[in-house]
Amino acid sequence: ISAPQREFLTSDAKYIYCQGGYGSGKTIIACVKAILLTVAIPGNRGVVIRESYPKLHDSTQRTFMECLDRAHIRYKGRENRDGWYHRLIIPVKGGSSEVFFRETKNLGRFLGSEFGWWLVDEALEVDKDVFKKLQGRLRLPAARGHYAGMLVSNPPHLNHWLHEVFGEEPRSFSVEVAIQGEIELSTFRYMQVSTRQNPHNPPGYLADLLTGLTQAEIDRLVEGQYGYIPDGPPVYPMFEHHRHVGLPTLP
């Protein structure tokens, strides 16, 4: 695995957000970590979240199921809709664990009361309210001491709630909360990953991705940095410093 993937996998932060460019390997390592938490803790319960079921089925859940198959992990499927299981029961040593797959629509209605981990893929597509609801359900007794709230996403715009919660620069930090005279800590980790850091992309992938992109688009879609996301066709071409700024022509 790549160095950023190893960092994500070994982080003990309660809430970890990985923001990365296309093909940076963020979704697959989040699925691997979710599976490890599922099989290592008997009775654990987790949920994989995406903005809609079509996106969940076509991308995130497909990756999750491929990881299970590669690891030769057996499971029993439940809640079959549209050819996809939305609940898995995974036999583990000492019992079994569960994994749910949900879209954000009517999330409160379909979420269980308690989870040991959750994973939100493409978090830029969901509202902050989803994050708050999931925070309130990260309390499964079986997973005490090993809770994990995971978010992965392509870079959102600068005024997105992810920027508000996790900050502008990659960092680890904690938030202190006073409860009945005692201080409790919530730990956070924000990672930023570039497409260039994934050695497993096919030959030519990065070159194809870079073709035709402006520097601002490269910063966001390749380097994984926050940036402006245009909506609709531009009235004027996007500003590029190297193209539109220069020395004046002297007479």
Where are each of the predicted segments found?
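ASCE P-loop NTPase helicase motor core
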Residues: E125-G204, D208
